[in-house]
């Protein structure tokens, strides 16, 4: 199977060398209509290659040299466009004095990117467009959606209205007041902090300071006093073991990490992704502009340090967006930094489309419907008035990392994928025990492990049949050749007996041995994306052969997240944020 992928930079702000990098994968199947999903990781300053190679892209890295197929990839029924946003993130770049500071500026630049992208690829401009992401993308996505809707309303003869069909935000940083307060609440619920303990008393004091700041100050995306709640929580709950301090992994509380990393060494795939994206052959295959002089880092600390928006938090944009666009918020149950309790609190306090929270009539709330996926308890769904909320059980901050197939089921359901014209075995996905509209995850006709195995067996059978027929032909040829050879030998011997006295009796040996067959062998092994030769002067199309042998399974503020400088530059730090400089998502 071959996948069509396109990669390159698009210039956004030429006066400051602002360029954005994208990686686009074409869909494998078209189910009733064309769709494009735009994926953004968070940070701010964290690369969407995280999403491409560790979450929803068609490949995962088994190690730094081996790509394997991701059975839950989101490009089954949708084109997927990964963008390193804002400028300076991942393979994107900009002059160091021109990093983005505000969310509205970021959104305007992203619309500029899309305008230029659709000029390059006009065949996708009529697609249903979905914008998805996680963590600090909970700020990016609503602002970008607002900018797109405003662009559509301005119109113009040359402006086609983009069909913004939906937004998906996973473990998003959306509403600081509720989400800051949820740190300690979540820690109590999970037993990380015991109520009444010294640690609890100290954290409650800091939470009161935070609440006071939020009450008197302007509504901002982040607050230093509130950030300290999480910093103190991780420090106060750290333990010593074997001379090493360990702390809770803030992205998956089932795990621990060395202090003060507390999750920055996670996920484990990062150990392979970073060296892979720094390989010269990969950089060349991805057509990374030579003007990008530093190596890839997951999160650019300078982007995060400069991103200090005075913009209002994105939660304030949701009511108007929900009038026009369906939104799905989803949460991994084991994430601390953007935990589900905070998301549920912000939904409960939100007023939209004539109601508050998930109240469907006065005193009646939309039910939480138990979700099972292939016979296992997967989480629950809740929805009302254009907003859907999904919790994934036993999952981290990066839900698609843990459950790519379940998130694909969620995506297909949200997009309204109709598989009736495609075939394949429907996925057993149920809400409250009832079969829901059918989706297919890894089981589309001609796709998935079963189909691939059947196709392999079919090809093997055809191959051996060809060999058998070829063998029969060869036997006939050999028989005729042997007869001809025998006749030729008999004739030559007869000649030599007549000319022996003249020729001196030398035996004339025929020369018929072929030479140089090694030169015809293609010694290049089955290739992943970097193996082919690409013309730098042409549109950057990467045709990637799907591996089938291995299948993938299911700043200046005292912010905790600021990490060590990267190997490449003091200006770039490998930082994770929640959104904020706290998470790669």
From Swiss-Prot:
Signal peptide (residue range): 1-18
Annotated GO MF terms: serine-type carboxypeptidase activity
Topology within the bilayer: Single-pass type I membrane protein
Cellular compartments per GO CC: membrane; trans-Golgi network
InterPro entries: AB_hydrolase_fold, Peptidase_S10, Ser_caboxypep_ser_AS
Residues with glycosylation annotation: 386, 394, 447
Keywords (A to Z) from UniProt: Apoptosis, Carboxypeptidase, Glycoprotein, Golgi apparatus, Hydrolase, Membrane, Protease, Signal, Transmembrane, Transmembrane helix
Cytoplasmic side of membrane: 491-585
Record-listed E.C. numbers: 3.4.16.6
Any one GO BP annotation for this protein: proteolysis
Compartment(s) where it occurs, according to its Swiss-Prot or TrEMBL record: Golgi apparatus, trans-Golgi network membrane
Record's catalysed reaction(s): Preferential release of a C-terminal arginine or lysine residue
Transmembrane segments: 470-490
Residues annotated as catalytic: 135, 335, 397
Keyword NADP belongs to the record: no
Compositionally biased intervals (Basic and acidic residues): 575-585
Lumenal side: 19-469
UniProt record similarity statement: Belongs to the peptidase S10 family.
Biological role stated in the UniProt entry: Protease with a carboxypeptidase B-like function involved in the C-terminal processing of the lysine and arginine residues from protein precursors. Promotes cell fusion and is involved in the programmed cell death.
Name used for this protein in its record: Pheromone-processing carboxypeptidase KEX1
């Amino acid at each position: 199977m071959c996948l069509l992928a396109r990669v390159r930079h698009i210039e956004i702000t030429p006066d400051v060398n602002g360029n954005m990098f994208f990686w686009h994968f074409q869909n494998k199947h078209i189910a009733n209509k064309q769709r494009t999903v735009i994926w953004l990781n968070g940070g701010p300053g964290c690369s969407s290659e995280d999403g491409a190679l560790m979450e929803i892209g068609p490949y995962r890295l088994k190690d730094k040299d081996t790509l394997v197929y991701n059975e839950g990839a989101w490009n089954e029924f949708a084109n997927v466009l990964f963008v390193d946003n804002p400028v300076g993130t991942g393979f994107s770049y900009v002059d160091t004095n021109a990093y983005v500071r505000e969310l509205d500026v970021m959104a305007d630049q992203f619309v500029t990117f899309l305008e230029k992208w659709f000029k390059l690829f006009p065949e996708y401009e009529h697609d249903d467009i979905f914008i998805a992401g996680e963590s600090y993308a909970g700020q990016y996505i609503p602002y970008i959606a607002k900018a797109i809707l405003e662009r559509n309303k301005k119109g113009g003869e040359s402006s086609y209205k983009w069909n913004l069909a939906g937004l998906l935000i996973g473990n998003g940083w959306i509403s600081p007041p509720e989400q800051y307060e949820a740190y300690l609440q979540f820690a109590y619920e999970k037993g990380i902090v015991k109520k009444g303990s010294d640690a609890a008393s100290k954290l409650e004091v800091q939470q009161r300071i935070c609440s006071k700041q939020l009450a008197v100050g302007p509504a901002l995306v982040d607050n230093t006093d509130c950030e300290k709640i999480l910093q103190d929580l991780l420090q106060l709950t750290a333990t010593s073991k074997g001379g090493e301090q360990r702390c809770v992994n803030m992205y998956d509380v089932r795990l621990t990490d060395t202090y003060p990393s507390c999750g920055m060494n996670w996920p484990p795939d990062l150990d392979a992704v970073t060296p892979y994206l720094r390989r010269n052959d990969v950089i060349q295959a991805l057509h990374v502009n030579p003007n990008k002089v530093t190596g890839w880092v997951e999160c650019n600390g300078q982007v995060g340090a400069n991103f200090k928006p005075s913009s209002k938090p994105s939660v304030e944009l949701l009511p108007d967006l929900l009038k026009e666009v369906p939104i799905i918020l989803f949460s991994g149950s084991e994430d601390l930094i953007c935990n589900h309790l905070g998301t549920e609190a912000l939904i409960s306090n939100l007023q939209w489309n004539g109601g508050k929270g998930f109240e469907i009539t006065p005193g009646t709330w939309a039910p939480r419907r138990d979700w099972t996926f292939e016979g296992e308890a997967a989480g629950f769904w809740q929805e009302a008035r254009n907003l859907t909320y999904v919790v994934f059980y036993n999952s981290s901050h990066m839900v698609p990392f843990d459950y790519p197939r379940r998130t694909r089921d969620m995506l297909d359901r949200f997009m309204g994928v109709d598989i009736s014209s495609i075939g394949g075995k429907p996925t057993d996905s149920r809400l409250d025990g009832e079969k829901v509209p059918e989706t297919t995850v890894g089981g589309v006709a001609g796709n998935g492990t079963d189909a691939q195995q059947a196709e392999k067996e079919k090809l093997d059978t055809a191959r051996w049949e060809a060999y058998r027929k070829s063998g029969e032909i060869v036997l006939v040829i050999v028989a005729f050749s042997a007869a001809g050879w025998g006749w030729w030998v008999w004739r030559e011997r007869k000649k030599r007996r007549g000319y022996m006295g003249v020729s001196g009796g030398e035996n004339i040996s025929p020369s018929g041995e072929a030479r140089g067959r090694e030169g015809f062998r293609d010694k290049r092994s089955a290739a992943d994306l970097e193996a082919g030769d690409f013309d730098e002067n042409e549109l950057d199309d990467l045709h990637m052969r799907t591996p089938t042998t291995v299948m993938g399974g299911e700043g200046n503020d005292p912010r905790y997240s600021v990490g060590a400088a990267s190997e490449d530059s003091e200006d770039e730090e490998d930082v994770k944020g929640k959104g904020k400089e706290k998470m790669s998502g």
